[in-house]
């Protein structure tokens, strides 16, 4: 059996968040029993506050967590000069089943957001999302080395192959080292789509859309995948869901692959090929 961590606004007794009039997010944990997620409860410890707590990444030994929350630490709630409480990254350690010793990362800043953590398979690199100055788009994906003493190095952008002028969010690196993320800047099927890029010499190259049925005409994000069992999860606000955003279980039934589409345009009468003809290709969602 395994643990399943997720964030939810299901606690309706909580104060509503002004931007969407839903309760603030909390982190929950559940059990995966026989392929089914059961027994969801608030995470035990000092993670959750009266503000937003969202994405988590946990080391392989289960002893350290990286998570994001509003700019709230040691009872102090801070805002930027524009009056916005940014999202910040924190770490916590697990002792006797309880998450405690909350510490902010060294590159948090009240003027921009830093969040959505993910870890490399070897646990030596932390990936995150930020709109810090110097980025290419609305939000970019960065990486930072994790030193042996637990301190973090200097953030480094994943570069122009990954980041666009739009939003790149929710990074995840699977056991094979493949990076998955969501973007509205790469060519997709809807709003946020899930993309992937394989590691090559320390960098990620060859961004590809993961395709349907993972992606929809809405927002698809927070993709998690275990290549050993070929199963995972994705969050989406696609039509047919129960709430604003829902979590869906996925299973790989065919290998991801590229294909070459060869199209020839001919004259309707002569049937001879037409040079420099424009071809528009649409999917089932009219994209």
What is each residue range found by the language model?
Residues 1-264, 268-270, 274, 278, ...:
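Short, conserved micro-motifs composed of acidic
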């Amino acid at each position: 059996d395994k643990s399943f961590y997720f964030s939810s606004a299901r606690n309706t007794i909580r104060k509503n968040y002004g931007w969407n009039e839903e309760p603030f997010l909390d982190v929950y944990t559940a059990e995966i029993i026989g392929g089914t997620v059961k027994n969801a409860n608030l995470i035990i410890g000092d993670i959750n506050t009266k503000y937003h707590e969202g994405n988590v990444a946990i080391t392989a030994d289960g002893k350290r967590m990286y998570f994001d929350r509003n700019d709230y630490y040691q009872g102090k709630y801070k805002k930027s000069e524009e009056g916005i409480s940014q999202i910040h990254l924190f770490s916590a350690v697990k002792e006797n089943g309880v998450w405690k010793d909350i510490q902010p990362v060294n590159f948090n800043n009240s003027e921009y957001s830093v969040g959505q953590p993910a870890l490399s398979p070897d646990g030596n690199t932390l990936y995150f999302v930020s709109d810090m100055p110097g980025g290419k788009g609305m939000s970019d994906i960065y990486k930072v080395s994790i030193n042996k003493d637990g301190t973090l190095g200097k953030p480094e952008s994943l570069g122009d192959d990954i980041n666009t002028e739009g939003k790149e969010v929710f990074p995840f690196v699977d056991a094979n080292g493949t990076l998955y993320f969501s973007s509205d800047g790469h060519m997709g099927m809807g709003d946020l789509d899930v993309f992937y890029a394989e590691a090559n010499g320390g960098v990620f190259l060859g961004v590809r859309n993961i395709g349907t049925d993972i992606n929809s005409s809405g927002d698809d994000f927070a993709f998690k995948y275990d290549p050993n069992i070929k199963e995972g999860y994705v969050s989406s606000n696609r039509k047919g869901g129960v709430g604003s955003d829902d979590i869906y279980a996925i299973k790989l039934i065919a290998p991801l692959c590229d294909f070459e589409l060869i199209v020839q345009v001919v004259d309707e009468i002569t049937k001879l090929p037409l040079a420099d003809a424009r071809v528009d290709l649409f999917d089932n969602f009219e994209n």
